[in-house]
């Protein structure tokens, strides 16, 4: 790497709001430290459920205009995190949000049905352009099993593997963004007052997450919570944030904590120094950027 090279990170996400919910604090953290941060979004999020009545008729079973509206939400969210406007894989609208398992096709190519050679090639081209030191996407289950998240995992994994030969760039560190069961448990237990219509749950009711022994890295995003919460509020058709900014809910009204840490599993590359828990505290740890 060249002398005094600026660190470059690439986050690959399925829909608008995923970048904020899973990695928003990390994005803001590295932007604040003058890293070059890129976010690629694979669909417009057309199949999302809409919170509230104001824009409810944008949904797929009415005007089917939600995807276009969510471009503005994603733009505002990225600005809150310190970035410019969105970048969509293949161009805005090239692949459609697939919806949850069992959602019917809407007449355009769904992301879950994307030709893998085309999709991987598009992301390889981004990797060749950005030459990221770190790439982040979902685990094989897509976090919670959403078909588009799983497809994003497959495409990103194949693109990282293909990039050395295709564009001459080997990604030094490749991570999955994951939920730490311990952090979620503590966050749920610490929840204060939430809107009366929200549903409180226990950690055992959330069917995904990783144990501490499976986690390789954590980023303390406490200082970035105002930026993350601002980005969450920008995704107003998808996320409701509690007045105090410490909890949020999606369209299912399940109360979830806004956590001050974001957790990762290192898939490939050499880990840097680890703390007493065995975790890196910097996704760039171990990289020689001088």
From Swiss-Prot:
Keywords per UniProt: Hydrolase, Metal-binding, Zinc
Record-listed Zn(2+) binding positions: 15, 18, 149
Pfam family, one: PIG-L
InterPro entries attached to this UniProt entry: GlcNAc_PI_deacetylase-related, LmbE-like_dom_sf, Mycothiol_biosynthesis_MshB
Major enzyme class: hydrolase
Cofactor note (record): Binds 1 zinc ion per subunit.
EC number: 3.5.1.103
Annotated catalysed reactions: 1D-myo-inositol 2-acetamido-2-deoxy-alpha-D-glucopyranoside + H2O = 1D-myo-inositol 2-amino-2-deoxy-alpha-D-glucopyranoside + acetate
Source organism, top-level taxon: Bacteria
GO terms classed as biological process: mycothiol biosynthetic process
A GO molecular function held by the record: N-acetylglucosaminylinositol deacetylase activity
Cofactor: Zn(2+)
General function of this protein: Catalyzes the deacetylation of 1D-myo-inositol 2-acetamido-2-deoxy-alpha-D-glucopyranoside (GlcNAc-Ins) in the mycothiol biosynthesis pathway.
Family: Belongs to the MshB deacetylase family.
Name under which the protein is recorded: 1D-myo-inositol 2-acetamido-2-deoxy-alpha-D-glucopyranoside deacetylase
Taxonomic source organism: Mycolicibacterium smegmatis (strain ATCC 700084 / mc(2)155) (Mycobacterium smegmatis)
Gene that specifies this protein: mshB
